[in-house]
From Swiss-Prot:
Stretches that traverse the bilayer: 8-28, 50-70, 103-123, 137-157, 168-188, 203-223, 247-267, 285-305, 337-357, 366-386, 393-413, 419-439
Catalytic activity: K(+)(in) + H(+)(in) = K(+)(out) + H(+)(out)
Organism: Verminephrobacter eiseniae (strain EF01-2)
Keywords tagged on the record: Cell inner membrane, Cell membrane, Ion transport, Membrane, Potassium, Potassium transport, Symport, Transmembrane, Transmembrane helix, Transport
Name under which the protein is recorded: Probable potassium transport system protein Kup
GO cellular component, as recorded: plasma membrane
Protein family membership: Belongs to the HAK/KUP transporter (TC 2.A.72) family.
Coiled-coil boundaries: none
Keyword Transmembrane helix: yes
InterPro entries in UniProt: K+_transporter, K_trans_C, K_trans_N, Kup
Pfam families membership: K_trans, K_trans_C
Function: Transport of potassium into the cell. Likely operates as a K(+):H(+) symporter.
């Protein structure tokens, strides 16, 4: 009992650091952007109205939508948009057109994650460093250089892994939440009447009295829910109960106290609007607060970078991106990975955002469109999961998701007003990633169609080969094939040039599924083809670690014993040649050919021993 309690406490502390770091640092800029826009005059009723909108936005979007509803839609314990997409796709698998539409929508939502992933670290770290301007205006010219140095250090340490320092994320973020709660409480005690803003009638009254202004400021209010998607994305790491405990026990109370404390400060000192968060603190605490805020924003950014690695790996295994280089940074935790291309690609985009927009206020204009569209997509996918996956009545499904869809649409529509102020930037990044993903998926489909059309039947081919069998050599040959039942090009090349066949021959197909995990008991399918030849299908979920030698070791005792020292892996390295035809648009064919050329080798991706791999090339026109 004591052990389970300590485990729950540890998971809850971990969730505070990883899940809520992003939303916890939104206090740095959310209130400033709403009141600093100039759309809202400083009157008591307006301040009460805005604070009420903040509180009920957190309640409806985070507490009710994500913590209560969306967390229930887990995919074998896993969360995130990719897991939700797989769940929705499986729920409507008997409706091919609807399934195709949902897959496109879900992949677009996943692409937008990268757009959001550029803005969030930029605005978080920049807003933390901007606290130096409150200490002294002379520090203003150093804000951007310091921000860039902090970001560079953050991305430079990724290849070393974060296992060692990761244990401090929870405690540091807990100190952050305690600090912002105390800052807010100190000002609330001076103006306790500010707590009347908890009543929803203040939010409704403000909206009815100022419909136009309300619609405009929703684009800034959305800043208070930055990182809400992380609640669901990190479900597999922590579980539902720790995430819910961390939200209702720590994050939500601390955020509420701080936002209301900032409101109390603005009522007393309207001039504090230039940076209400830092101006809540006494002068002696400013420098320590800037340091703590920087640490908190770095932790929030770290969680997003780790999420980008994880999502990219999942998308690759679902077949929407080519294989990329993956390095494991921990021998104990296979989930801790480093992807150089993703890491430095994100860094370049974030630096570009900081240099282009130059302040957290300007970046706030860029934030919102991508994340609110992602929220709307999550709501849409949730509807299809509970309607077709869980089989709930249509009326109940509409009631459960309809109100959230209306809220998401309102926030999205408001953020569209910021399209030309900077909202185009994350949309552009998301659009580029989406084009890459869809081009790769369609290119692979066309490539497989071409390979199947040209392929010989494996059983017929082996039957003809063994009518006049070639010389057999000791050892095992493993031939990787895209689909079962077809002769791999590597086998044809081997017979043509070497004129030998190994004593044992395995024709292996790796099949990735739209489910997060597939256990060892369902890992292998094996079919004997005679003459010590086998057709092997290896099944993986999109979160499983692909390790071919380890999977093939499971064949022991099933008629096929593999000795690692005498096993060779034969791979086909295809060169794609774009042609004018009925495939994709010419620019997409050229893009696919380039992506295919630059893809990481299958040997590294499948953990094959480099000294046992033989690659044989061929050219394929699409």
């Amino acid at each position: 009992m004591q052990s389970s309690k300590s485990s729950l406490a540890a998971l809850t502390l971990g969730a505070i650091g990883v899940v809520y770091g992003d939303i916890g640092t939104s206090v740095l800029y959310a209130v400033k952007e709403v009141f600093g826009s100039g759309h809202v005059p400083f009157t008591q009723s307006n301040v009460y109205g805005i604070l009420s909108i903040f509180f009920w936005t957190l309640t409806v979007i985070v507490s009710l939508k994500y913590v209560v509803l969306v967390l229930r839609a887990d995919n074998h314990g896993e969360g995130g948009l990719v897991a939700m997409l797989a769940l929705a796709s499986q729920a409507v698998k008997d409706k091919p057109r609807l399934r195709s539409a949902l897959l496109a929508v879900g992949i677009f939502g996943t692409s937008l994650f990268y757009g959001d992933g550029v803005i969030t670290p930029a605005i978080s770290v920049l807003s933390a460093i901007e606290g130096l301007e409150v200490v002294s205006p002379h520090f203003k010219k150093y804000v951007i250089p310091i921000t860039l140095v902090v970001l560079f250090c953050l991305f430079a340490v990724q290849k070393r892994g974060t296992g060692g320092i990761g244990r401090f994320f929870g405690p540091i973020t807990l100190v952050w939440f305690a600090s912002i709660a105390l800052l807010g409480l100190a000002h609330i005690l001076g103006h306790p009447e500010i707590l009347w803003a908890l009543s929803p009638h203040h939010a409704l009254g403000f909206m009815f009295a100022n419909p136009g202004t309300s619609f405009i400021i929703l684009g800034a209010v959305v800043l208070c829910v930055t990182g809400a998607e992380a609640l669901y994305a990190d479900l597999g790491h922590f579980g539902k109960r720790p995430i819910r405990l961390a939200w209702f026990g720590v994050a939500m109370p601390a955020l509420t106290l701080n936002y209301f404390g900032q409101g109390a400060l603005l009522l007393a000192e309207p001039g504090a609007v230039r940076n209400p968060f830092y101006m809540m603190a006494p002068d002696w605490a400013l420098i320590p607060l800037v340091v703590l805020a920087t640490m908190a924003t770095v932790i929030a950014s770290q969680a997003l970078i780790t999420g980008a690695f994880s999502v990219t790996k999942q998308v690759i295994q679902l077949g929407y991106l080519p294989r990329l280089g993956i390095q494991h940074t921990s021998v104990r935790d296979t989930g801790q990975i480093y992807m150089p291309l993703v890491n430095w690609g994100l860094f370049v985009a974030i630096v570009l955002a900081v240099v282009m927009f130059r302040s957290s206020s300007n970046l706030a204009a860029a934030y919102g469109i991508a994340v609110t569209l992602d929220m709307l997509i999550t709501t849409t996918l949730t509807f299809f999961v509970i309607r077709y996956g869980w089989g709930y009545p249509l009326a109940l499904c509409v009631a459960a998701t309809g109100c959230f869809a209306v809220v998401d649409l309102a926030f999205f529509a408001s953020n569209l007003l910021k399209l030309f102020q900077g909202g185009w930037f994350p949309l552009m990044i998301g659009g580029i990633v989406f084009a890459l993903m869809m081009t790769w998926k369609e290119g692979r489909r066309l490539l497989n169609v071409k390979l199947r059309a040209d392929a010989l039947d494996l059983k017929d081919f082996l039957a003809s080969v063994f009518t006049n069998p070639p010389t057999r050599v000791e050892g095992t040959a493993v031939f990787l094939t895209a689909g079962t039942g077809a002769v791999p090009n590597a086998l044809l090349h081997n017979l043509k040039h070497n004129k030998v066949l190994h004593q044992q021959n395995l024709f292996v197909t790796v099949h990735n599924h739209e489910t997060p995990w597939i256990g060892l008991d369902r890992r292998l399918q094996i079919e004997s083809l005679g003459h010590d030849c086998w057709q092997v299908v290896i099944h993986y979920g999109f979160k499983n670690d692909l390790d071919l030698p380890r999977a093939l070791a499971l064949l022991r005792g099933r008629g096929c014993d593999i000795e690692p020292m005498s096993t060779s892996y034969f791979l086909s390295r295809d060169t794609v040649i774009p042609t004018i035809g009925s495939g994709m648009a010419p620019w997409r064919e050229k893009l696919f050919a380039q992506m295919h050329h630059n893809a990481s080798g299958a040997a590294d991706f499948l953990h094959l021993p480099s000294n046992a791999v033989v690659e044989l090339g061929s050219k394929i026109e699409i």
